[in-house]
Regions:
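HTH-adjacent hinge/linker in prokaryotic transcriptional regulators
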Residues: 1-83, 87-88, 94-102, 106, ...
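Conserved phosphate- and dinucleotide-binding cores of soluble alpha/beta proteins
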Residues: 2-10, 16, 31, 111-246
Length: 246
């Protein structure tokens, strides 16, 4: 719930379902620690128990994500094979890739597939597997097996959280898929907006020093920037885009 809190009656009206159904579903979410029910109001709780859905994430830090994409596109060369993960940050790249054609794009993300399937000069390799609706992507053993048979010039990804200068996600399936892409790519690029340094998740993927480039947005704190550079991270600060950052 993007509003943070909502009356239970509003949920029933919005989705045209019974109050009994709403209460049953909210009870399950409350049991999982994702919200609190009190006096007819459901309130979302901050949580690292699950990955957020792409529908929610796509609207979060949209300006910063576009800033990161504009910086990342300069690291792609025509003729390359490029892995793209299922993050909403990397999805900002899809509208920019035509300028780098011809390219081969390999992805497990349904939204990226839909964006690029008719773009001239883009050869698209779609990875199948078990479909996960919350992130609009395919993951699982079938997906990682297919990835292991491929080799790419570049892998571009984002992450749910950065703790102790390590990328973290809350889903083991996400970790397995991204690590497989990471391992078969010659160059690895991480896109991370400033909010990722304030979040936590369960499963570690890679240290930031393992990436060839870590791109952060202009609102990243000077303390984070200085610390990362002091550790030898190949850090790029995306320039502020006029008209995008308030």
């Amino acid at each position: 719930m993007t509003e943070g809190a909502i009356r239970i009656e509003q949920i029933a009206e919005r989705f045209d379902i019974s109050l009994m159904t709403v209460h049953r579903d909210l009870d399950e979410l409350e049991f999982r620690g994702l919200l609190r029910k009190s006096r007819g109001i459901a309130t979302a709780l901050p949580s690292s128990l699950v990955e957020s859905s792409d529908v929610f994430r796509v609207s979060q830090q949209a300006d910063a994500k576009h800033q990161l994409a504009l910086a990342a596109i300069d690291l792609i060369e025509p003729g390359q094979a490029v892995f793209l993960d299922d993050s909403t940050t990397v999805q900002q790249l899809t509208g920019l890739l035509a300028a780098k054609a011809p390219l081969t794009v390999i992805t497990n993300c349904l939204m990226v597939i839909n964006e690029l399937n008719s773009v001239r000069g883009i050869s698209l390799v779609a990875l199948g597997g078990n479909y996960y609706n919350w992130c609009s992507s395919f993951m699982g053993r079938m997906t990682t097996t297919a990835i292991e048979q491929l080799r790419a010039d570049v892998f571009i990804m984002s992450t749910a959280a950065i703790t102790d200068d390590i990328c973290f996600h809350q889903s083991q399936e996400t970790i397995d898929t991204k690590r497989a892409m990471f391992d078969v790519s010659a160059k690895r690029i991480l896109l991370a907006d400033h909010t990722k340094f304030k979040k936590r998740a369960l499963y570690g993927l890679a240290q930031l020093t393992e990436f060839d480039h870590v791109i952060v947005d202009s609102r990243t704190s000077s303390d984070d920037i200085d610390r990362l550079r002091g550790k030898g991270t190949h850090l790029l600060v995306a320039p502020e885009t006029p008209g995008l950052i308030a």
